[in-house]
């Protein structure tokens, strides 16, 4: 690796810590910032700080929110009786691009993974059970990723939630096993939502 001036080397190192960014991409990004106007670099750094300082988790569903409640939980046009459970906030983006789901969400912030030491207590499941206990939820659509952890999470949720009197469905296949909802196109996600099956 070539020797870079310390500030540039540090920026490259920080960019490499981002998912999907290797050495060459990190270098390209760092040189872009170096060539950019100071004002543009300040806007970028302020946007990063704002994300950390001004965003939190929705008190209802654990999605990203810039207030106490996210835009989906506060939207009175959405159906509160249908809740789609996803692993991460970015999974909501893929579902929303279909423009077909009109219910609400619940974000687990992960999936069960005994090999990595992630058990049910480490996920945001308690709030989902509490929402169901309030009596408004009729159906829970489990839209965890189609991999081992996602399937294990789906089975666990079905066993936990069915005795509470709600219909538990799993999104249909069409999303390749081992993939992530984030990378699926809107038609595939739309078909998976239409083809959901009861668990």
From Swiss-Prot:
Tree of life domain: Bacteria
Q: Does the keyword tRNA processing apply?
A: no
Query: Sorted alphabetically, which InterPro entries does this protein's record hold?
Result: DNA_Rcmb_RecR, Rcmb_RecR, Rcmb_RecR_Znf, TOPRIM_dom, TOPRIM_RecR
Q: GO biological process: what's one of them?
A: DNA recombination
User: Which Gene Ontology molecular-function terms are recorded?
Assistant: DNA binding; zinc ion binding
Q: Which Gene3D superfamilies match?
A: 3.40.1360.10, 6.10.250.240, RecR Domain 1
Cite the entry's keywords alphabetically: DNA damage, DNA recombination, DNA repair, Metal-binding, Zinc, Zinc-finger
Residue span(s) of domain Toprim: 81-176
| Zinc finger regions, C4-type | 58-73
Matches recorded under SMART domains: TOPRIM (SM00493)
Q: Does the keyword Zinc-finger apply?
A: yes
HAMAP family documented for this protein? RecR
Protein role: May play a role in DNA repair. It seems to be involved in an RecBC-independent recombinational process of DNA repair. It may act with RecF and RecO.
Q: Which family does it belong to?
A: Belongs to the RecR family.
Protein name, as recorded: Recombination protein RecR
């Amino acid at each position: 690796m070539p020797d870079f001036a310390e500030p540039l080397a540090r920026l490259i190192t920080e960019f490499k810590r981002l998912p999907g960014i290797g050495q060459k991409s990190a270098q390209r990004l760092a040189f872009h910032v170096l060539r950019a106007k100071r004002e543009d670099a300040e806007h970028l750094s302020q946007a990063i700080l704002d994300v950390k300082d001004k965003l939190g988790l929705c008190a209802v569903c654990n999605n990203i929110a810039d207030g106490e409640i996210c835009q989906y939980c506060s939207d009175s046009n959405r159906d509160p009786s249908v809740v789609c459970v996803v692993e991460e906030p970015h999974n909501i983006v893929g579902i929303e691009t279909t423009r077909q789901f009109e219910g609400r969400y619940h974000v687990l912030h992960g999936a069960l993974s005994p090999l990595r030491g992630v058990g049910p207590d480490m996920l945001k499941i308690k709030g989902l059970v509490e929402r169901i206990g309030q009596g408004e939820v009729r159906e829970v659509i489990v839209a965890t990723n189609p991999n081992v952890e996602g399937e294990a999470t789906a089975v666990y949720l079905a066993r936990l939630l069915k005795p509470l009197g709600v219909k538990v469905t799993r999104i249909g296949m069409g999303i390749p096993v081992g993939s992530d909802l984030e990378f699926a196109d809107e038609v595939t996600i739309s078909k998976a939502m239409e083809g959901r099956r009861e668990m």
